[in-house]
Amino acid sequence: GFVISKHRRLSRKKSYENLLIGGPTGSGKTTTLLFKTICNLENCSLIINDPSGELYHLTSGFLSQTRAIKTLNFSDSSKSSGFNPLERIIKQTDCHKVAEMLVASQQKGHGGGDPFWGLQSQALITLFIQLLLYQEMKYRNMANLVDLVNWFASAPKAIDRIVVKAGDAKLLSEYKALISFPQRTLQNIVASVKASLKIFTDDEVAKVTSFDSLNFAELRKAPTVLFIHNSVGDQRYFSTLNAIFFEQLYGYLLSELPDKDALDVFFVLEEASSLYIPLLPLALANLRKYRSGSIICT
């Protein structure tokens, strides 16, 4: 279980109920508690938010003897596993969730405005995600979602043809409803969508999200440690990606109770106060039923 002092630790079952660690910088939270917890937890998978990379350097060599080690770094594609949010879209609800998070992250801190623009931005993003899913697998990524929006703004007739070619009557009907808005209104919606997708114009982000090498199902089957390396200073910039990643991961873990042979999954969220994870309160309240627990370190 989680280590709570030099000679004490929680039981595995009690660790499902989460642990909050607080203390000033230099108080030994990382080296005294987190390091020991990470090295002593066995027969499980770990998701570790490690902005500074300190935990990776302290533990990855030891952990690699018995577990698969992966990293997720949105600012450095050469050191990162791939994470494509579109890879996990199975039904229309999943499209709506991704679109909602993209728009909500962009509007965070700007409450009180007309909800019309946010709702229509979500509708347009949802529509274009669905359109991408009709294309070959290699084209289904966030950079191409940005391209679709840009083509829609500059060459709408090309998008008309792609929509018709998809052969989806419902999609075509929704597209017709969208383009029926007055030109000025449509331009404002597109501008709002571009702002929501701006992060994916970053070359490194585009590369990391162009493919997917993170299989959430493997977390329950084989001991795996995933280190998330995005510096504290970059958390606001990558807030959209963090929100989508944790939304999809928590959603997967909460989708069904694990069988008796499945591995536990634990989270170590260093510098948790800098993360934007809308689903975190709900996840903390419910994950114990799914044999998962979290250390929240502030």
Regions found by a protein language model. Give the residues of each.
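P-loop NTPase motor domains
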Residues: 3, 10-293
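H-loop/switch region of ABC-family ATPase nucleotide-binding domains
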Residues: 298
